[in-house]
Amino acid sequence: MENFAEKKISKPLTFGEGIQYVLDRISIKPEDRQTFKEDAQQIQNEFVRAISKQDPYFASAFRGLALTGSSLDNVRINLPDEFDMLTKIKMPCKLEPVPIRSHPGYVFLRASGDNIPIHLVDRWEDEYCIDRLKVQAWFRDNITAVIPELSNIRCNDGRSYELVNKTIGDVAHTIQAKCLSDPDRSISFDFVPAFEFSASEWPRIFPQHRNEDRSWYAVPSEFKYPNVGDDPLSFLVCAPYWERMVLTKKQHLKDGYRLMKAMRDANDMPKIYSYTIKSVFLNASNVNKLINWNQSPGRILIRAIDLLAMFLRKGKLPSYLVPDRNMLDRLSVDMRQDYRRKLCHIFRRLIRCRDRDCMTSEDLQFIFGMRY
């Protein structure tokens, strides 16, 4: 296919050509994909090795890293320089997920049997449950201890990296690897503590999904609802490999997903997270004929923007895994209205481009923040 991003353009593009131009601009170069992947693997290995050496309990509990997020779904744009990693932990006792009925998608992790890790649990009625604040403190203390020694991780082609702790949220531990030989190159990692469960352990009160016996996870997360008190025992369920099954073999869907991310970045909508966009596509895939995935990426983008605007108007975007959980709970009414207004303007501009089969440089600037 002709790469419009690499040619000189002397006349207005058709709608399809304009969309392809954007896809070419935001696509990841094969050489970048390879070198970032290799460097990330080496950095991850050194990071885990250092913590395992620092903390024998972590070494005995660690069960590997599982890629999640946009890199797993192959929808990252521009550079493959961010990696979301589930850090799998196995406790030496039995853990049972107990749904929190008042908070859809959340569970307690009840600990029982021998060898309950007293330093990571708290009392819940007459039983023990994993305390996410203690788990996060455990991770944080280990990271703080090893970061100073990870100042020169050697990778391929003479590149070396220094690690810096950038954690600010309540779920992931964010580590930035700064390339010492190239100040413009860095790699960001979000390490999320994750307790792994088999598909058969998925709580029965939650909707059932196609899973091919793949695992799901419980990750530390405070309640995402406004004006609700925190509970240190709360964990959120996630199943990235189940969700990946829904998106697989739908290349036009993934192209529409990438276009949505580029549109969001260009129009100052930072609270429309990548997972928010993913939830729009998961919901559309879950309802027969809501979107025709055989359409061109540009037409899928138009439909997806229309759907997101509808969800913002209603104030609710259902989670794919647990539909009673609202993915928009943390957006204020004013922010929802602001984002919806922007989306409606973009939607109308795209419709005009589609109907006249022409996408000018000004159109691309308005929608995607780029020109040809």
Swiss-Prot record:
Catalytic activity: GTP + ATP = 3',2'-cGAMP + 2 diphosphate; GTP + ATP = pppA(2'-5')pG + diphosphate; pppA(2'-5')pG = 3',2'-cGAMP + diphosphate
Keywords (A to Z) from UniProt: Antiviral defense, ATP-binding, GTP-binding, Immunity, Innate immunity, Magnesium, Manganese, Metal-binding, Nucleotide-binding, Nucleotidyltransferase, RNA-binding, Transferase
Entry keyword annotation includes Transferase: yes
Binding, ATP: 70, 82-84, 240-243, 261, 274-278
Regulation: The enzyme activity is specifically activated by double-stranded RNA (dsRNA).
Residue ranges the record marks as coiled coil: none
Protein name as it appears in the record: Cyclic GMP-AMP synthase-like receptor
Native source species: Drosophila eugracilis
